[in-house]
Protein backbone atom coordinates (compact mmCIF):
# COMPACT_ATOMS: atom_id res chain seq x y z
CA UNK A 1 0.00 0.00 0.00
CA UNK A 2 1.37 3.41 -1.00
CA UNK A 3 0.51 6.43 1.14
CA UNK A 4 1.49 10.05 0.49
CA UNK A 5 1.15 12.18 3.62
CA UNK A 6 1.73 15.95 3.50
CA UNK A 7 2.86 17.57 6.77
CA UNK A 8 2.39 14.32 8.72
CA UNK A 9 0.79 14.40 12.16
CA UNK A 10 2.51 12.23 14.76
CA UNK A 11 -0.42 9.95 15.57
CA UNK A 12 -1.31 9.20 11.96
CA UNK A 13 2.33 8.98 10.91
CA UNK A 14 3.04 6.36 13.57
CA UNK A 15 0.02 4.34 12.46
CA UNK A 16 0.85 4.46 8.75
CA UNK A 17 4.55 3.78 9.28
CA UNK A 18 3.61 0.57 11.10
CA UNK A 19 0.90 -0.33 8.60
CA UNK A 20 3.06 -0.04 5.50
CA UNK A 21 6.72 0.69 6.33
CA UNK A 22 7.90 0.50 2.72
CA UNK A 23 4.92 2.27 1.19
CA UNK A 24 4.54 5.22 3.54
CA UNK A 25 5.83 8.49 2.06
CA UNK A 26 5.65 11.40 4.55
CA UNK A 27 6.70 14.75 3.05
CA UNK A 28 7.16 18.32 4.22
CA UNK A 29 8.89 21.53 3.19
CA UNK A 30 10.90 21.51 6.44
CA UNK A 31 11.63 17.85 7.29
CA UNK A 32 14.20 18.73 9.97
CA UNK A 33 11.34 19.75 12.25
CA UNK A 34 10.27 16.12 12.68
CA UNK A 35 11.96 14.24 15.50
CA UNK A 36 9.66 11.21 15.53
CA UNK A 37 9.88 10.29 11.85
CA UNK A 38 12.11 10.48 8.80
CA UNK A 39 10.33 12.86 6.43
CA UNK A 40 11.19 13.50 2.80
CA UNK A 41 11.85 17.11 1.80
CA UNK A 42 9.16 18.27 -0.60
CA UNK A 43 8.20 21.72 -1.84
CA UNK A 44 4.61 21.80 -3.05
CA UNK A 45 5.32 24.89 -5.15
CA UNK A 46 8.05 23.25 -7.23
CA UNK A 47 7.79 19.48 -6.71
CA UNK A 48 4.18 18.47 -7.40
CA UNK A 49 5.03 17.61 -11.01
CA UNK A 50 7.58 15.05 -9.79
CA UNK A 51 4.88 12.82 -8.28
CA UNK A 52 4.50 9.66 -10.34
CA UNK A 53 1.10 9.25 -12.00
CA UNK A 54 -1.29 6.66 -10.55
CA UNK A 55 1.01 5.72 -7.68
CA UNK A 56 -0.73 6.21 -4.34
CA UNK A 57 -3.56 4.29 -2.71
CA UNK A 58 -4.06 7.07 -0.18
CA UNK A 59 -3.12 10.75 -0.21
CA UNK A 60 -3.88 12.86 2.82
CA UNK A 61 -3.26 16.33 4.17
CA UNK A 62 -4.78 18.47 6.90
CA UNK A 63 -4.71 22.26 7.02
CA UNK A 64 -1.99 22.84 4.45
CA UNK A 65 -3.83 24.38 1.49
CA UNK A 66 -4.24 27.71 3.28
CA UNK A 67 -0.43 27.97 3.41
CA UNK A 68 0.39 27.12 -0.22
CA UNK A 69 1.56 30.09 -2.33
CA UNK A 70 0.41 28.40 -5.52
CA UNK A 71 -2.84 27.87 -7.39
CA UNK A 72 -5.17 25.39 -5.70
CA UNK A 73 -6.05 24.06 -9.16
CA UNK A 74 -2.38 23.18 -9.73
CA UNK A 75 -2.05 21.44 -6.37
CA UNK A 76 -5.20 19.35 -6.64
CA UNK A 77 -4.57 18.47 -10.29
CA UNK A 78 -1.36 16.72 -9.30
CA UNK A 79 -2.91 15.17 -6.19
CA UNK A 80 -5.57 13.44 -8.28
CA UNK A 81 -3.06 12.62 -11.01
CA UNK A 82 -0.84 10.82 -8.49
CA UNK A 83 -3.78 8.87 -7.07
CA UNK A 84 -4.47 5.32 -8.24
CA UNK A 85 -7.73 4.62 -10.04
CA UNK A 86 -9.18 3.11 -6.87
CA UNK A 87 -7.23 5.39 -4.54
CA UNK A 88 -8.63 7.73 -1.89
CA UNK A 89 -7.79 11.35 -1.14
CA UNK A 90 -8.57 12.59 2.39
CA UNK A 91 -8.13 16.17 3.57
CA UNK A 92 -9.25 18.92 5.91
CA UNK A 93 -8.96 22.69 5.57
CA UNK A 94 -9.90 25.70 7.72
CA UNK A 95 -13.34 26.53 6.33
CA UNK A 96 -14.30 29.93 7.70
CA UNK A 97 -17.27 32.32 7.65
CA UNK A 98 -17.52 34.65 4.66
CA UNK A 99 -16.15 34.43 1.14
CA UNK A 100 -12.97 33.17 -0.50
CA UNK A 101 -9.94 35.43 -0.54
CA UNK A 102 -6.41 34.82 -1.77
CA UNK A 103 -3.19 36.73 -2.30
CA UNK A 104 -0.01 35.07 -3.57
CA UNK A 105 2.18 38.17 -3.67
CA UNK A 106 4.46 39.56 -0.95
CA UNK A 107 2.61 40.45 2.24
CA UNK A 108 3.89 41.48 5.66
CA UNK A 109 3.11 39.24 8.63
CA UNK A 110 0.87 41.95 10.03
CA UNK A 111 -1.10 42.33 6.80
CA UNK A 112 -1.39 38.56 6.32
CA UNK A 113 -2.69 38.15 9.87
CA UNK A 114 -5.20 40.94 9.35
CA UNK A 115 -6.39 39.58 6.02
CA UNK A 116 -6.25 35.80 6.54
CA UNK A 117 -6.19 35.36 10.32
CA UNK A 118 -2.64 34.01 10.50
CA UNK A 119 0.72 35.36 9.37
CA UNK A 120 1.63 32.33 7.22
CA UNK A 121 -1.73 31.97 5.44
CA UNK A 122 -2.24 33.09 1.84
CA UNK A 123 -5.97 32.37 1.48
CA UNK A 124 -9.26 32.46 3.35
CA UNK A 125 -11.55 29.53 2.54
CA UNK A 126 -15.03 30.95 3.01
CA UNK A 127 -18.09 28.75 3.37
CA UNK A 128 -20.39 31.28 1.70
CA UNK A 129 -18.91 30.56 -1.75
CA UNK A 130 -17.58 27.06 -1.04
CA UNK A 131 -18.84 25.81 -4.41
CA UNK A 132 -16.71 28.40 -6.19
CA UNK A 133 -13.31 27.36 -4.80
CA UNK A 134 -12.83 23.85 -3.36
CA UNK A 135 -16.24 22.74 -4.55
CA UNK A 136 -15.45 23.88 -8.09
CA UNK A 137 -12.41 21.59 -8.25
CA UNK A 138 -13.94 18.40 -6.87
CA UNK A 139 -17.23 16.94 -5.73
CA UNK A 140 -17.35 17.32 -1.96
CA UNK A 141 -19.90 16.18 0.58
CA UNK A 142 -21.15 19.35 2.26
CA UNK A 143 -23.47 17.50 4.65
CA UNK A 144 -20.60 16.36 6.86
CA UNK A 145 -21.99 14.47 9.86
CA UNK A 146 -19.84 12.22 12.04
CA UNK A 147 -22.89 11.11 14.02
CA UNK A 148 -23.94 9.06 10.98
CA UNK A 149 -20.70 7.10 11.17
CA UNK A 150 -19.81 6.98 14.87
CA UNK A 151 -21.83 6.72 18.05
CA UNK A 152 -21.96 9.62 20.53
CA UNK A 153 -19.98 7.46 22.92
CA UNK A 154 -17.20 6.98 20.36
CA UNK A 155 -17.13 10.70 19.56
CA UNK A 156 -16.87 11.59 23.25
CA UNK A 157 -14.08 9.06 23.68
CA UNK A 158 -12.19 10.79 20.85
CA UNK A 159 -12.81 14.18 22.49
CA UNK A 160 -14.65 15.60 19.46
CA UNK A 161 -16.94 18.43 20.62
CA UNK A 162 -20.52 18.55 19.37
CA UNK A 163 -19.83 21.77 17.45
CA UNK A 164 -17.29 19.95 15.29
CA UNK A 165 -19.27 16.80 14.58
CA UNK A 166 -21.23 18.11 11.60
CA UNK A 167 -21.29 20.93 9.05
CA UNK A 168 -18.54 22.87 7.25
CA UNK A 169 -15.73 24.10 9.49
CA UNK A 170 -12.06 23.56 10.21
CA UNK A 171 -12.65 20.02 11.46
CA UNK A 172 -14.61 18.83 8.43
CA UNK A 173 -12.92 15.85 6.80
CA UNK A 174 -13.44 15.27 3.08
CA UNK A 175 -12.88 11.93 1.35
CA UNK A 176 -12.66 11.92 -2.45
CA UNK A 177 -11.67 9.64 -5.32
CA UNK A 178 -10.52 10.23 -8.89
CA UNK A 179 -14.14 10.30 -10.01
CA UNK A 180 -14.75 13.32 -7.80
CA UNK A 181 -12.22 15.48 -9.62
CA UNK A 182 -14.22 17.93 -11.72
CA UNK A 183 -11.41 18.93 -14.10
CA UNK A 184 -10.52 15.42 -15.22
CA UNK A 185 -10.26 14.40 -18.86
CA UNK A 186 -8.91 16.08 -21.94
CA UNK A 187 -10.54 19.39 -22.63
CA UNK A 188 -11.50 19.86 -26.25
CA UNK A 189 -11.81 23.40 -27.47
CA UNK A 190 -15.07 24.16 -29.29
CA UNK A 191 -14.59 24.11 -33.04
CA UNK A 192 -14.45 27.60 -34.45
CA UNK A 193 -14.30 27.92 -38.26
CA UNK A 194 -11.27 29.77 -39.55
CA UNK A 195 -12.19 33.32 -40.56
CA UNK A 196 -12.32 34.15 -44.24
CA UNK A 197 -9.24 36.37 -44.86
CA UNK A 198 -10.87 38.43 -47.63
CA UNK A 199 -13.97 39.11 -45.59
CA UNK A 200 -11.89 40.01 -42.54
CA UNK A 201 -9.76 42.39 -44.63
CA UNK A 202 -12.87 44.16 -45.92
CA UNK A 203 -14.24 44.48 -42.39
CA UNK A 204 -10.99 46.03 -41.18
CA UNK A 205 -10.84 48.50 -44.10
CA UNK A 206 -14.45 49.49 -43.49
CA UNK A 207 -13.72 50.06 -39.82
CA UNK A 208 -10.59 52.10 -40.56
CA UNK A 209 -12.49 54.32 -43.01
CA UNK A 210 -15.12 54.90 -40.35
CA UNK A 211 -12.45 55.57 -37.73
Kindly label every feature range from the protein language model.
Residues 3, 50, 57, 121, ...:
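Acidic/proline-rich low-complexity IDRs
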Residues 201-211:
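Long, low-complexity, intrinsically disordered segments
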Residues 19, 51, 111-114, 119, ...:
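Alpha-helical structural elements
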Residues 53, 199-202:
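Basic, mixed-charge low-complexity alpha-helical segments
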Residues 2-104, 124-131, 173-180:
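Conserved SAM-binding loop
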Residues 69-80, 84, 88-200:
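S-adenosyl-L-methionine-dependent methyltransferase catalytic module, highlighting the catalytic core
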